[in-house]
């Protein structure tokens, strides 16, 4: 299918903060009827039941998983709602893969090693924001502070900043569920991407996986109290 500008349309992402709504499932059905050959992505959710519902009745190809795990998201603090990202990925991946659907893990990525953990939990794709923030390619102005430090603003889509920018302010019946932070300027994004890709390659080497698809088959998770040696902080 071709879009208005003549570009071939291959993917459509139906993105809402709360995927636990019958309206979303009905909307996904209608989009599928309009776009029978397009890959449909929908979320966000964190549990088995709604994953199955979206795949079976919503006709979704890829489920987007994660509530409250983003670096600039405050949903868990404001609402008490959310689930540990790895636990959510493991539960939803089991349901999605059983129905021949795929899964994208959205949020919770702080270091390159977190990519390997997401893939190890069963994610087919990983979506991230904070590690890519602050680069030349990111939108927004490069701001120079009085001391010469350069930074860019990074904010959640449910933050005051986003709602003032896109919706004319925060509605009186709701609260902000995101924050705005200053991210030190990092330069070109390619260096960060190379670092992340290198981390994933090393993950595969350590656990004996020949490709990303095999990481979940080779990974074993162990609960620890301290992930790294903090002698030199």
Where do the model's predicted regions map?
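Alpha/beta catalytic cores of nucleotide-metabolism and tRNA/nucleoside-modifying enzymes
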Residues: 58, 80-105, 109-233
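Short, surface-exposed basic-aromatic patches at helix termini and helix-loop junctions that form
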Residues: 32-34, 55-60, 119-120
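Short beta-strand/loop segments at the ligand-binding rim of alpha/beta enzyme cores
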Residues: 8-11, 31-46, 62, 95-107
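Short, surface-exposed alpha-helical recognition segments that flank or form part
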Residues: 15, 19, 188-191
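Non-cysteine beta-strand/loop elements that form the S-adenosyl-L-methionine
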Residues: 60-69, 128-129
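Active-site-adjacent beta->alpha loops and helix N-cap segments on the catalytic face
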Residues: 1, 16-39, 45-54, 70-93, ...
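Short, conserved catalytic/metal-binding motifs centered on acidic residues
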Residues: 14, 63, 211
């Amino acid at each position: 299918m071709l879009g208005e500008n003549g570009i071939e349309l291959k993917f459509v992402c139906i993105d809402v903060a709360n995927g636990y709504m019958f309206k979303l499932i009905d909307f996904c059905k209608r989009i599928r009827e309009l776009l029978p050959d397009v890959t449909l992505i929908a979320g966000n959710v964190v549990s088995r039941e709604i994953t199955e519902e979206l795949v079976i009745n919503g006709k979704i190809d890829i489920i987007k998983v994660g509530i409250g795990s983003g670096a600039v998201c405050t949903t868990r603090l404001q609402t008490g709602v959310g689930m540990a990202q790895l636990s959510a990925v493991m539960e939803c991946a089991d349901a999605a893969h059983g129905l021949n659907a795929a899964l994208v893990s959205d949020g919770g990525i702080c270091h390159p090693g977190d990519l390997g953990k997401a893939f190890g939990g069963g994610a087919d794709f990983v979506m991230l924001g904070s590690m890519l923030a602050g680069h030349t390619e990111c939108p927004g102005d490069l701001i120079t502070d009085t001391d010469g430090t350069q930074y860019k603003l990074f904010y959640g889509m449910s933050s005051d900043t986003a709602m003032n920018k896109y919706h004319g302010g925060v509605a009186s019946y709701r609260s902000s569920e995101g924050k705005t932070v200053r991210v030190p300027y990092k330069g070109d994004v390619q260096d960060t991407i190379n670092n992340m890709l290198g981390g994933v390659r090393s993950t595969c080497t350590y656990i004996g996986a020949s490709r990303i698809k095999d990481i979940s088959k080779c990974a074993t998770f162990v609960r620890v109290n301290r992930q790294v040696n903090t002698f030199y902080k």
